[in-house]
Amino acid sequence: MDIQEINQSSPEFLYQMLGRLEVDCLYYLGNGGRFAGHLWAGNEREQIKLMWMIYRRLCEIGAAPEWMSEQQINDFAEQMLVV
């Protein structure tokens, strides 16, 4: 998924996708044994990058999710060693 696809997607889809990416991160850090194959994007860096792109797009269109914050994405990045 690239920035063009993100910009063309509905807010509903972006919420769903961001939620999916969050759940993948939680599983990766927990029962997933830190296996990158469990991540939608296939690796840690791309997963976090995609989360940022979606989050920023939602903020741009005035639809920032109440259940996700910049700090949470940063925390995932630190825990997944991509900072």
Q: Which residue stretches match the model-derived regions?
A:
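Extended rod-forming repeat segments used as scaffolds/tethers
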Residues: 29-31, 51, 82
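N-terminal acidic leader/helix
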Residues: 2-39
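Functionally constrained cores in energy, signaling, and assembly domains
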Residues: 22, 44, 83
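Short, charge-rich amphipathic interface segments used for partner binding and complex assembly
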Residues: 35-79
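Short intrinsically disordered terminal tails
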Residues: 1-12, 65-67, 75-83
